[in-house]
Amino acid sequence: MKALLLGAPGAGKGTQAQFITAAFGIPQISTGDMLRAAIKAGTPLGLEAKKIIDEGGLVRDDIIIGMVKERIAQDDCKNGFLFDGFPRTLAQAEAMVEAGVDLDAVVEIDVPDSVIVDRMSGRRVHLASGRTYHVTYNPPKVEGKDDVTGEDLIQRDDDKEETVKKRLAVYHEQTEVLVDFYSKLEGEHAPKYIKVDGTQPVEAVKAEVLGALGK
């Protein structure tokens, strides 16, 4: 099973990724992990990427695609892989097809923006322990205070409504192009496109995703 998982920040993609990788015995591949591994291993592509990152630049697509090809040639990918957050752009998706990296399925966890804003902007965190609360779904016993220590809870910058809305706008801009690209592919290159309602309970989303993937 060679699949790509799409979902906005806060859509519950990470949870579903764990279910998919466990069900099919395949690794989850993210560009961040791949870059770190290549840099640590000191591969030629890793060294080139490190130089660009150290200079504050963005790693070029040709380096990323090269790393992807190296990564999916490894033994643990013989039954397939799950791409998470890659490809991000139309150029990357096109380069993947040109490089002969085909996908069996593209899975999108679909959650309305209003639900995601509510999920993320309601998060509160106790920094010292990492304990996380939600003002609606998992509130602390005392508003704004950690249950264990009584210390203040904070709202991370990433979870502020304006930030969440900006991230969603970027996600839609990128993803709509990808969805359009994959849905128009024909013949052997065409993956199955699966859109799942991510507002359902976690187990229901899991059942629908795995069912659509043939498990």
Swiss-Prot record:
Q: Could you tell me what reaction this enzyme catalyses?
A: AMP + ATP = 2 ADP
Quote the record's binding site residues for ATP: G10, A11, G12, K13, G14, T15, R123, T132, Y133, Q200
**Predominant place of localization:** cytoplasm
Q: What class of enzyme is it?
A: transferase
**What pathway is it annotated to?**
Purine metabolism; AMP biosynthesis via salvage pathway; AMP from ADP: step 1/1
Record protein name field = Adenylate kinase
* Protein's cellular compartments: Cytoplasm
Q: Where are the transmembrane segments?
A: none
Annotated GO MF terms? adenylate kinase activity; ATP binding
Query: Which source organism?
Result: Neisseria meningitidis
